[in-house]
């Protein structure tokens, strides 16, 4: 999982990427290709 400052570039990398909020953090998840996972950094 990558930790990046802005998720805008992460969510447009693949059409199956979804932006999810969990425990106050924002994540990008992708069930079809899990290597696109990312988390907002701050």
UniProtKB/Swiss-Prot annotation:
Protein name per its UniProtKB record: Large ribosomal subunit protein bL36
Coiled coil: none
Record key words, sorted: Ribonucleoprotein, Ribosomal protein
UniProt organism field: Ehrlichia ruminantium (strain Gardel)
Similarity remark: Belongs to the bacterial ribosomal protein bL36 family.
UniProt xrefs under PROSITE patterns: RIBOSOMAL_L36
Entry keyword annotation includes Ribonucleoprotein: yes
InterPro entries given in the database record: Ribosomal_bL36, Ribosomal_bL36_sp, Ribosomal_L36_bact
GO cellular component entries: ribonucleoprotein complex; ribosome
Gene (UniProt): rpmJ
GO biological process, one term: translation
């Amino acid at each position: 999982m990558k930790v990046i400052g802005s998720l805008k570039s992460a969510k447009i990398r693949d059409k199956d990427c979804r932006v999810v909020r969990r425990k106050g953090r924002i994540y990008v998840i992708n069930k079809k290709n899990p290597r696109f996972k990312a988390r907002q950094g701050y």
